[in-house]
Design a protein with these regions (language model features):
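N-terminal secretory/targeting leader peptides
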Residues: 2-19, 24-122, 132-360
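Core domains of carbohydrate- and sulfate-ester-processing enzymes
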Residues: 127-131
Length: 360
């Protein structure tokens, strides 16, 4: 189930949903799984992907394969879902792999790293490159098999009590930043904080942190960050295209019939596309509403971007010298990134640059 099977299974989703294989489905046993999400139920975008996944599995199996979806904190804490899958507390988790870089930095390569791939490039690396193969080899060490479970697209750069005008403003900044990016923020003089999405607002409101990032306008507006920190930065250089994953225990997955395995993969493919579409469709209006309500947008200064890039590349070299898992996967990732960046510089960036300079 590598590369092009994602596309094949996405097509299978339509075939099975249309009832083209009732005999195959009806012959299957009843299955009940539990899914633990790392996200709050209030976010119909990022949490919603798990609902889409579970719904499609149910539909394509004729109701014989049911997955109950549980938000962060219901069954497991947001950052405890991988352990939950490993020990069999739940069969599947929906999460951002980079949350677990403390287990091994290589987890971040399955999600997002600073100045990494954008969402289209990430999906391309997974399906047509070596991404899915390499990450599955790595995740097997943790008794997990992964299926792509959505992408937010390029993110914003977070909410700040005071705008960042230069590198000097990064010094001592208590910043809630997701996953692996905290390592770079720390090298830049900041103080990274790893806080689940549902707890960020309270931390900002109480002044426990100076700044926080989550995803983008739609989610951030729902979480109310604009009420406690008026300055909104861009771009989110640490998350050009963060991929979410469905992590399934290898024993649970191996116990499924071939037909159920195909349904799981097809349902994940639908959820993957659905999440990106939701973000792309909902962020524009949310951004307009935020600005109309007093949010102040600012671009990260050049010295901040250049320092972040320099420190990121140095960090990757340091990790490659110490972690053979990272070295193997990152070497392939970096080559793919270089090739993609060269191509996107012409057709994609050329078109986007012109379009964004026009008035519609």
């Amino acid at each position: 189930m590598e590369r092009r099977s994602f596309v094949r299974q996405a097509g299978l989703a339509g075939i099975l949903a249309a009832g083209a294989a009732p005999a195959v489905v009806n012959a299957q046993a009843n299955i009940r799984w539990r899914l633990a999400s790392s996200f709050p139920k209030s976010l119909d975008t990022i949490y919603g992907a798990a609902d889409v996944f579970a719904k499609k599995v149910g539909e394509m199996s004729g109701g014989k394969f049911q997955i109950s979806v549980h938000s962060a904190g219901e069954l497991l804490p947001a950052f405890g879902v991988v352990d939950g899958v490993q020990n069999g507390t739940v069969e599947v988790a929906h999460t951002a792999p980079y949350y677990f870089f403390g287990k091994d930095e290589t987890f971040a390569l399955g999600c997002a790293i600073p100045f990494g791939l954008n969402s289209r490039q990430m999906t391309a690396w997974m399906i047509e490159g070596n991404g899915l193969k390499l990450m599955r080899e790595f995740y097997a060490n943790f008794n997990i098999i992964n299926f792509m479970g959505g992408n937010t697209g390029a993110q914003m750069g977070g909410w700040y009590r005071k705008p960042i005008n230069s590198m000097a403003d990064m010094k001592g900044l208590k910043f809630r930043v997701g996953g692996f990016a905290g390592k770079v923020v720390e090298r830049m003089g900041g103080v990274p904080q790893n806080i689940p999405g549902g707890e960020i607002y309270q931390s900002l409101e109480k002044g426990t942190i100076d700044a926080a990032e989550w995803v983008g306008p739609y989610d951030d507006q729902k979480l109310g960050f604009n009420k406690v920190a008026p300055n909104y930065a861009f771009p989110g250089w640490w998350e050009g295209g963060p991929q979410l994953d469905f992590f399934i225990g290898t024993k649970a997955f191996a116990a499924l019939t071939p037909e159920y395995k195909a349904i799981v993969e097809a349902a994940a493919a639908v959820a993957h596309v659905d999440m990106q579409a939701k973000y792309d469709a909902r962020n524009p209006l949310a951004l307009k509403q935020l600005v109309a309500g007093g949010t102040k947008l600012f671009r990260f200064p050049k010295d901040v971007m250049e320092t972040a890039f320099k420190e990121s590349m140095a960090l990757y070299e340091d990790i490659s010298a110490k972690n053979p898992n990272w070295k193997k996967v990152y070497a392939d990732y970096a080559k793919f990134r270089a090739d993609e960046t060269l191509w996107f510089r012409f057709a994609e960036a050329g078109f986007d640059d012109f379009m964004q300079s026009q008035k519609f």
